Protein backbone atom coordinates (compact mmCIF):
# COMPACT_ATOMS: atom_id res chain seq x y z
CA UNK A 1 0.00 0.00 0.00
CA UNK A 2 2.40 2.69 -1.17
CA UNK A 3 1.91 6.44 -0.91
CA UNK A 4 2.61 8.65 -3.95
CA UNK A 5 3.03 12.42 -3.96
CA UNK A 6 1.81 13.87 -7.27
CA UNK A 7 3.11 17.13 -8.73
CA UNK A 8 1.02 20.06 -9.97
CA UNK A 9 -1.74 18.56 -12.15
CA UNK A 10 -3.29 21.88 -13.27
CA UNK A 11 -6.22 20.31 -15.04
CA UNK A 12 -4.12 17.77 -16.98
CA UNK A 13 -6.42 14.78 -16.62
CA UNK A 14 -4.95 12.58 -19.36
CA UNK A 15 -1.34 12.80 -18.08
CA UNK A 16 -2.63 12.05 -14.57
CA UNK A 17 -4.30 8.87 -15.77
CA UNK A 18 -1.17 7.83 -17.66
CA UNK A 19 0.93 8.43 -14.55
CA UNK A 20 -1.39 6.33 -12.41
CA UNK A 21 -1.19 3.56 -14.99
CA UNK A 22 2.61 3.75 -14.92
CA UNK A 23 2.77 3.31 -11.14
CA UNK A 24 0.14 0.55 -11.27
CA UNK A 25 -2.08 2.55 -8.95
CA UNK A 26 -4.53 0.52 -6.87
CA UNK A 27 -7.34 2.90 -5.94
CA UNK A 28 -8.56 0.60 -3.18
CA UNK A 29 -5.22 0.41 -1.36
CA UNK A 30 -2.76 3.12 -2.44
CA UNK A 31 -2.86 6.67 -1.08
CA UNK A 32 -2.23 9.71 -3.28
CA UNK A 33 -0.78 12.95 -1.93
CA UNK A 34 -1.49 15.91 -4.20
CA UNK A 35 0.87 18.85 -3.79
CA UNK A 36 -1.73 21.35 -5.01
CA UNK A 37 -2.73 23.28 -8.10
CA UNK A 38 -5.13 20.56 -9.09
CA UNK A 39 -6.81 22.99 -11.47
CA UNK A 40 -6.39 25.77 -14.02
CA UNK A 41 -4.43 26.41 -17.21
CA UNK A 42 -4.90 22.80 -18.35
CA UNK A 43 -7.91 21.56 -20.34
CA UNK A 44 -9.72 19.28 -17.87
CA UNK A 45 -9.94 20.82 -14.40
CA UNK A 46 -13.46 19.53 -13.82
CA UNK A 47 -12.50 15.95 -14.69
CA UNK A 48 -9.48 16.16 -12.37
CA UNK A 49 -11.58 17.39 -9.45
CA UNK A 50 -14.30 14.79 -9.99
CA UNK A 51 -11.74 11.99 -10.18
CA UNK A 52 -9.89 12.98 -7.01
CA UNK A 53 -13.16 13.62 -5.18
CA UNK A 54 -14.33 10.09 -6.01
CA UNK A 55 -11.22 8.19 -4.89
CA UNK A 56 -12.15 5.44 -2.40
CA UNK A 57 -8.96 5.96 -0.36
CA UNK A 58 -9.13 9.55 0.85
CA UNK A 59 -6.23 11.46 -0.73
CA UNK A 60 -4.06 13.98 1.07
CA UNK A 61 -4.24 17.39 -0.62
CA UNK A 62 -2.45 20.65 0.03
CA UNK A 63 -4.03 23.67 -1.59
CA UNK A 64 -2.14 25.64 -4.23
CA UNK A 65 -2.56 29.19 -5.48
CA UNK A 66 -4.67 28.08 -8.46
CA UNK A 67 -6.96 26.08 -6.18
CA UNK A 68 -7.43 29.15 -3.99
CA UNK A 69 -8.11 31.22 -7.11
CA UNK A 70 -10.94 28.86 -8.05
CA UNK A 71 -12.33 29.17 -4.53
CA UNK A 72 -12.10 32.95 -4.81
CA UNK A 73 -14.17 32.80 -7.99
CA UNK A 74 -16.73 30.44 -6.48
CA UNK A 75 -17.14 32.02 -3.07
CA UNK A 76 -15.41 35.40 -2.91
CA UNK A 77 -16.74 37.26 -5.90
CA UNK A 78 -13.25 37.49 -7.38
CA UNK A 79 -13.03 38.52 -11.06
CA UNK A 80 -11.51 36.35 -13.77
CA UNK A 81 -7.76 36.92 -13.88
CA UNK A 82 -7.51 36.71 -17.64
CA UNK A 83 -7.45 34.57 -20.74
CA UNK A 84 -5.17 31.95 -19.15
CA UNK A 85 -7.87 30.77 -16.74
CA UNK A 86 -9.57 27.50 -17.74
CA UNK A 87 -12.02 27.27 -14.86
CA UNK A 88 -15.30 28.12 -16.56
CA UNK A 89 -16.33 24.48 -16.87
CA UNK A 90 -16.00 24.05 -13.10
CA UNK A 91 -17.87 27.29 -12.44
CA UNK A 92 -20.80 26.24 -14.63
CA UNK A 93 -20.98 22.58 -13.56
CA UNK A 94 -23.97 21.38 -11.56
CA UNK A 95 -21.54 20.00 -8.97
CA UNK A 96 -19.09 22.91 -9.13
CA UNK A 97 -20.12 24.39 -5.80
CA UNK A 98 -20.12 20.96 -4.14
CA UNK A 99 -16.57 20.39 -5.38
CA UNK A 100 -15.62 23.86 -4.14
CA UNK A 101 -16.87 23.15 -0.63
CA UNK A 102 -14.90 19.89 -0.64
CA UNK A 103 -11.80 21.69 -1.89
CA UNK A 104 -11.89 24.47 0.70
CA UNK A 105 -11.79 21.84 3.46
CA UNK A 106 -8.42 20.49 2.28
CA UNK A 107 -5.08 21.23 3.91
CA UNK A 108 -2.22 23.69 3.64
CA UNK A 109 0.25 21.19 5.09
CA UNK A 110 0.23 17.40 5.35
CA UNK A 111 2.76 15.30 7.22
CA UNK A 112 3.55 11.74 8.22
CA UNK A 113 5.98 10.86 10.97
CA UNK A 114 6.05 7.27 9.71
CA UNK A 115 7.20 8.40 6.25
CA UNK A 116 9.24 11.33 7.62
CA UNK A 117 7.48 13.63 5.13
CA UNK A 118 5.91 17.06 5.26
CA UNK A 119 4.18 18.36 2.12
CA UNK A 120 2.92 21.81 1.17
CA UNK A 121 2.37 23.53 -2.14
CA UNK A 122 5.11 26.17 -2.36
CA UNK A 123 7.28 25.33 0.63
CA UNK A 124 7.79 26.26 4.26
CA UNK A 125 8.70 29.84 5.12
CA UNK A 126 12.38 30.15 6.06
CA UNK A 127 11.40 31.86 9.33
CA UNK A 128 9.25 28.94 10.52
CA UNK A 129 10.24 25.72 12.20
CA UNK A 130 7.98 22.72 11.70
CA UNK A 131 5.90 23.37 14.81
CA UNK A 132 5.24 26.96 13.72
CA UNK A 133 4.37 25.88 10.16
CA UNK A 134 1.91 23.26 11.41
CA UNK A 135 0.25 25.74 13.75
CA UNK A 136 -0.12 28.43 11.09
CA UNK A 137 -1.42 25.93 8.54
CA UNK A 138 -4.06 24.85 11.06
CA UNK A 139 -4.97 28.48 11.69
CA UNK A 140 -5.61 29.20 8.01
CA UNK A 141 -7.34 25.87 7.42
CA UNK A 142 -9.81 26.73 10.19
CA UNK A 143 -10.76 29.92 8.33
CA UNK A 144 -11.08 28.20 4.95
CA UNK A 145 -13.28 25.43 6.31
CA UNK A 146 -15.21 27.63 8.74
CA UNK A 147 -18.11 30.05 8.47
CA UNK A 148 -16.09 33.15 7.46
CA UNK A 149 -14.64 31.72 4.26
CA UNK A 150 -16.56 34.14 2.01
CA UNK A 151 -14.87 37.12 3.66
CA UNK A 152 -11.42 35.60 3.33
CA UNK A 153 -11.78 34.70 -0.35
CA UNK A 154 -13.07 38.18 -1.13
CA UNK A 155 -9.91 39.77 0.29
CA UNK A 156 -7.12 37.19 0.04
CA UNK A 157 -5.21 38.71 -2.90
CA UNK A 158 -2.24 40.97 -2.27
CA UNK A 159 1.54 40.93 -1.90
CA UNK A 160 1.68 42.69 1.47
CA UNK A 161 2.72 42.06 4.12
CA UNK A 162 5.72 40.28 2.64
CA UNK A 163 7.48 39.01 5.77
CA UNK A 164 6.28 37.03 8.74
CA UNK A 165 5.86 38.60 12.17
CA UNK A 166 4.21 37.10 15.22
CA UNK A 167 2.60 40.50 15.75
CA UNK A 168 0.47 40.26 12.59
CA UNK A 169 -3.27 39.94 13.10
CA UNK A 170 -6.43 39.66 11.03
CA UNK A 171 -6.38 39.61 7.26
CA UNK A 172 -2.71 40.67 7.06
CA UNK A 173 -1.75 37.62 9.08
CA UNK A 174 -3.86 35.26 6.99
CA UNK A 175 -2.61 36.74 3.72
CA UNK A 176 1.08 36.33 4.50
CA UNK A 177 0.49 32.76 5.72
CA UNK A 178 -1.32 32.08 2.43
CA UNK A 179 1.45 33.60 0.34
CA UNK A 180 4.23 31.64 2.03
CA UNK A 181 2.38 28.34 1.69
CA UNK A 182 1.03 28.81 -1.85
CA UNK A 183 2.98 31.49 -3.77
CA UNK A 184 6.54 31.51 -2.42
CA UNK A 185 9.56 30.93 -4.64
CA UNK A 186 12.22 33.47 -3.75
CA UNK A 187 13.00 35.32 -0.52
CA UNK A 188 15.71 37.75 0.50
CA UNK A 189 18.35 36.90 3.10
CA UNK A 190 15.93 37.78 5.91
CA UNK A 191 13.08 35.58 4.67
CA UNK A 192 11.10 38.39 3.06
CA UNK A 193 8.96 37.19 0.15
CA UNK A 194 9.68 38.36 -3.38
CA UNK A 195 6.63 37.54 -5.48
CA UNK A 196 7.79 39.42 -8.56
CA UNK A 197 10.61 37.31 -9.97
CA UNK A 198 9.51 33.86 -11.21
CA UNK A 199 12.38 32.87 -13.49
CA UNK A 200 15.25 30.44 -13.38
CA UNK A 201 17.87 30.26 -10.64
CA UNK A 202 20.67 31.20 -13.02
CA UNK A 203 19.08 34.56 -13.83
CA UNK A 204 17.82 35.46 -10.36
CA UNK A 205 18.83 38.83 -8.89
CA UNK A 206 21.79 38.55 -6.53
CA UNK A 207 19.82 39.51 -3.44
CA UNK A 208 17.28 36.71 -3.85
CA UNK A 209 17.50 33.09 -2.73
CA UNK A 210 15.28 30.10 -3.38
CA UNK A 211 13.31 29.73 -0.16
CA UNK A 212 15.19 26.52 0.67
CA UNK A 213 18.59 28.29 0.41
CA UNK A 214 17.84 31.35 2.55
CA UNK A 215 20.78 31.68 4.99
CA UNK A 216 18.56 32.10 8.06
CA UNK A 217 16.22 29.21 7.18
CA UNK A 218 15.18 27.15 10.17
CA UNK A 219 15.93 23.46 9.84
CA UNK A 220 12.93 21.21 9.27
CA UNK A 221 13.26 17.76 10.80
CA UNK A 222 11.34 15.98 8.02
CA UNK A 223 11.86 15.71 4.28
CA UNK A 224 9.89 18.45 2.51
CA UNK A 225 7.85 17.76 -0.64
CA UNK A 226 6.67 20.79 -2.59
CA UNK A 227 5.43 21.82 -6.04
CA UNK A 228 4.51 25.22 -7.51
CA UNK A 229 7.89 25.94 -9.13
CA UNK A 230 7.98 24.43 -12.61
CA UNK A 231 11.19 26.26 -13.55
CA UNK A 232 13.11 24.03 -11.12
CA UNK A 233 12.10 21.01 -13.22
CA UNK A 234 12.12 18.80 -10.15
CA UNK A 235 15.54 19.80 -8.84
CA UNK A 236 16.56 21.43 -5.57
CA UNK A 237 19.96 21.89 -3.96
CA UNK A 238 19.00 19.88 -0.88
CA UNK A 239 18.74 16.07 -0.83
CA UNK A 240 15.88 16.18 1.69
CA UNK A 241 13.84 18.79 -0.18
CA UNK A 242 11.90 17.25 -3.06
CA UNK A 243 10.57 19.48 -5.85
CA UNK A 244 7.88 17.62 -7.80
CA UNK A 245 6.38 20.25 -10.11
CA UNK A 246 8.05 19.18 -13.35
CA UNK A 247 6.11 21.41 -15.71
CA UNK A 248 3.43 19.05 -17.00
CA UNK A 249 1.63 21.93 -18.67
CA UNK A 250 4.75 23.59 -20.05
CA UNK A 251 6.52 20.93 -22.09
CA UNK A 252 7.70 18.93 -19.10
CA UNK A 253 6.33 15.94 -17.24
CA UNK A 254 3.90 14.98 -14.52
CA UNK A 255 5.78 13.35 -11.67
CA UNK A 256 4.94 11.00 -8.81
CA UNK A 257 7.26 10.51 -5.83
CA UNK A 258 6.82 7.21 -3.99
CA UNK A 259 7.14 8.28 -0.40
CA UNK A 260 8.33 4.96 1.01
CA UNK A 261 11.61 5.05 -0.95
CA UNK A 262 11.61 8.49 -2.68
CA UNK A 263 11.63 6.89 -6.15
CA UNK A 264 10.29 9.10 -8.96
CA UNK A 265 8.01 8.20 -11.85
CA UNK A 266 7.13 10.56 -14.70
CA UNK A 267 5.06 10.74 -17.88
CA UNK A 268 5.13 13.38 -20.63
CA UNK A 269 2.81 16.33 -20.27
CA UNK A 270 1.62 18.98 -22.70
CA UNK A 271 3.04 21.89 -24.62
CA UNK A 272 6.47 23.37 -25.23
CA UNK A 273 8.96 24.15 -22.50
CA UNK A 274 9.22 27.75 -21.31
CA UNK A 275 12.39 27.03 -19.34
CA UNK A 276 15.01 26.01 -21.90
Curated annotation (Swiss-Prot):
EC numbers? 3.6.1.41
User: Recorded GO terms, molecular function?
Assistant: bis(5'-nucleosyl)-tetraphosphatase (symmetrical) activity
Per its UniProt entry, what is the enzyme's top EC class, as one word?
Answer: hydrolase
Please name every pair of cysteines joined by a disulfide bond in this record: none
- Superkingdom of origin organism: Bacteria
Database matches in SUPFAM superfamilies = Metallo-dependent phosphatases
Q: What catalytic activity is recorded? A: P(1),P(4)-bis(5'-adenosyl) tetraphosphate + H2O = 2 ADP + 2 H(+)
Keyword list (alphabetical) reads:
Hydrolase
- Pfam short name (any one): Metallophos
Per its database record, what is this protein's job? Answer: Hydrolyzes diadenosine 5',5'''-P1,P4-tetraphosphate to yield ADP.
Q: Which HAMAP family match?
A: ApaH
Which family does the entry's similarity section mention? Belongs to the Ap4A hydrolase family.
Name of the protein this chain belongs to: Bis(5'-nucleosyl)-tetraphosphatase, symmetrical
Q: What organism does the record attribute this protein to?
A: Legionella pneumophila (strain Corby)
Amino acid sequence: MPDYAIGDVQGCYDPLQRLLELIDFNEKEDCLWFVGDLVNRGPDSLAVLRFIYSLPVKPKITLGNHDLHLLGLLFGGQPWKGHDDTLEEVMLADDGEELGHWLRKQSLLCRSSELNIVMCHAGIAPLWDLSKAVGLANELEAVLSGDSYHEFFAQMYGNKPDIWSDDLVGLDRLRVITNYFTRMRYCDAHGRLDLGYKGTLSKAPNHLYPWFEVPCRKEIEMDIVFGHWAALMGRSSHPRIHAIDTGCLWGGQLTALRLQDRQRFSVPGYGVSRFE
